[in-house]
Amino acid sequence: MEKLVYFDYAATAPVRPEAVRALTDALERFGNPSSRYEYGRQAALRVKEDRETVARAVGCAPGELFFTSCGTEGDNWAIRRGAELNPRKGKHIITTAVEHAAVLETCKDLERRGYEVTYLKPDRTGRITVEQLTAALRPDTVLVSMMLVNNETGVVLPVEPCARAVKAADPAVLFHCDAVQGFLKLPGPLARLGADLVTISGHKIGAPKGIGALYVKKGVRLRPLLTGGGQEEGLRSGTEATAQIAALAAAVRAVQGDAGRLERTAAVKEYTLSKLREAVPRLEVISEGDAPHICAVTLPGYKSEVVVRVLGDRGVCVSSGSACHRGR
């Protein structure tokens, strides 16, 4: 079989060897963290240590970080429960038209349940401004949801100044950030963004699929989305996925230990764009100076699905949109 060249890390990243080793080791340590005997205590201690690792990377306290199955679960939890947190205030939500489907489809479902949602439209470069957001605020606004990095274009949205502006205008408005594409891909901890709720996912940084986390800022009384045995301090029921959690923590340590990764990624993007411009003079670049790990271009006169198919036939893996929608 022809060797494949993989260019779609925004869809998922290969599982890091460190994560594989941690996963395998944890699978052999099979105890349930809720059990009170030795196997359970060992598992609980491992989860505690892994939570501390991920929390440090996010920039929050371990008690503010709750493990989930994926970014979609985190987004659903944050938006559905965040929107209902202050029912007397109102039922108005603000988000952007370029969010991940986990946010957009959840907002559409809430619209069917009586909420009103304002979708901020980006300019032709994919950007949203602070002024757009503050102009959309209303007395009945209860929640704002804005992604950090767009998974298709690589545009970095102004989450930090937007969160600051929202809190200055109305501290009662909750601010959620889907940071799945930004976690450990941009400098600085996510907690500095000033959001009340932040979603992350493991498989974008080399952990296996099936593990993510939601940062819930201290003082935000979010109700659980999943009820049952009361795991995760009663906020996310279900036996903890100890092996996936261990792999996530291992991936976090591996990424953080990779000195110069951001500069190296930016250099690869710059090199790729320079070669593409040489080959295709009419190439149009989207978000050239934004996220270093996403390179989005358009080829005037060519249909994207044709380009994807032709490159795929030659062993080059690229996408024409979000792989979070089936078949793209």
Model-derived segments and spans:
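Pyridoxal 5′-phosphate
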Residues: 1-328
